[in-house]
Amino acid sequence: MRLGFAGAGGDALSYAVDLGLPPPKPPSAFNRDPEVKTEVIWSGPVPRPAARLVERAGAALRVRDGRGWATVGRVLPPWTSMLTEYADPQAAPEMLTLRDAVRAWRFYDHFRCDVQAPARAPQLGSRTPVLSGDGHDFAAALQTINEIGDAEALYAAVADAFDGAQVAVQISDDGRFEVTMQQPGMLRPLRTAELSDGTLRFLMWAVALLTPRPPPLMVLNEPETSLHPDLLPALGALIARASRETQLIVVSHAMRLVAAIEDAAPADACQRIELEKSLGETVAQCHGACDAPQWHWPER
């Protein structure tokens, strides 16, 4: 299996890793675990010999040293990446730069909204510019947007989605934060524990997308789950807005959401890639939209 990505820009860092099965000897219960065969960091889109900055072959690692190479006197375990095993800001600053960039990526797969979900309970709060994957810091993240983020955009998105509703953060005497929602016609605000699954999930998506610290890449998996169809246009507008500051990959089965994103985003800012099954294999049906940057896999 091979994984890789190219950085944006002509001199940006690119990375590739090639994984395979280990040799059968010595015998081990883990002989089915993949191991790293090669890893390469290079500058630009193509891993030409002159563009390579760091190379790994099996357990051996070498880094660029002027016009030549310097071998790192350290044996790398075959089951771990060189990005986690070696860090030297002098000899290989590219590894630290790349590692920090990858760590900044955010993946949101599923926000829990069940009765026992962490987001439904009051939680101790501290400044939270990035919403966690399980949503336990939901109230603190919303309050952080109130203080240092685009609170106006948050309030506008909620009002648009829920017919003029307003959200607020209540803070108890012991420092616990809880989100409340005031809807027109209701005599009192609803606590987080009283919100429907779809309402809570939309609010969490809004907080994640309006983060005061946008990442270089954010991936959303089926954000339409549990949402009422009438909420999808508002969610699409939020996603389109967030795409101004970060690269977004959205995996969705809801064509209404896809259409809402395309309607809200600039014409050249959105690329649709449709997937279909062909003899049990998932393939991309791009119809000319998948013209990717030039890419070459490094050889083993």
Task: Set out the residue ranges of the language-model regions.
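Electropositive, glycine-dotted interaction segments
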Residues: 6-156
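Short, mixed charged/polar active-site loops
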Residues: 10-14, 187-189, 281
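A residue-level structural signal marking coil residues immediately N-terminal to beta-strands
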Residues: 215-216, 246
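Conserved ABC ATPase signature
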Residues: 143, 152, 156-159, 163-210, ...
